[in-house]
Every structure is written in structure tokens, then in C-alpha cells.
Amino acid sequence: MKTKLREMLRFPCFFTYKIIGLAQPELIDQIIKVIQIQIPGDYTPQVKSSNRGNYLSVSITICAKNFEQIECLYHEISKINIVRMVL
């Protein structure tokens, strides 16, 4: 799958992550903090709450210069303890 994704993308390109995490106030700040370290910029995430309000879905778009940035951010965002899934 990684090879196919790498072949499909032309850099620089916009890439959107969808992150599912616990509905805690610090979730969005922690995600943006991780992204700012790799790719500084002004980010406006789209946030939706789950039906029961236990989880948040955060969609955030970056401008990646290479595939390694996409992979690195995927792994770094996954390390946030209140993140449950990164797509």
C-alpha cells in the first residue's frame, strides 16, 4: 500500500489526515503542536464530535514536501496518548 500511495502523490502536495481521539480539550492543540514541529504553518482543523460525545474526529490538511513528511507525521501523531486512530 505504501508504494502505491507514494506513486500516486506528486510533491509538494496537500495531504489530509483524519484523526480520531478522545474528546478532551487538549487534543487539537497537541495535534497542531506535533504538526508545527515538522511543517510550521497556520492550520484550521475541521472538528466533529461523536454521537455520544466521547470522541472527536479531527481533519487537518498539510502541504507536504515529500513522502517522508507524511510518514513521519503519521507516526508522531499516533504517539499522542489520547489519539486512537490516524487515517
Swiss-Prot record:
Pfam families in the record: DUF493
Annotated Gene Ontology cellular component terms: cytosol
Family: Belongs to the UPF0250 family.
Protein name: UPF0250 protein BU488
The organism of origin for this protein: Buchnera aphidicola subsp. Acyrthosiphon pisum (strain APS) (Acyrthosiphon pisum symbiotic bacterium)
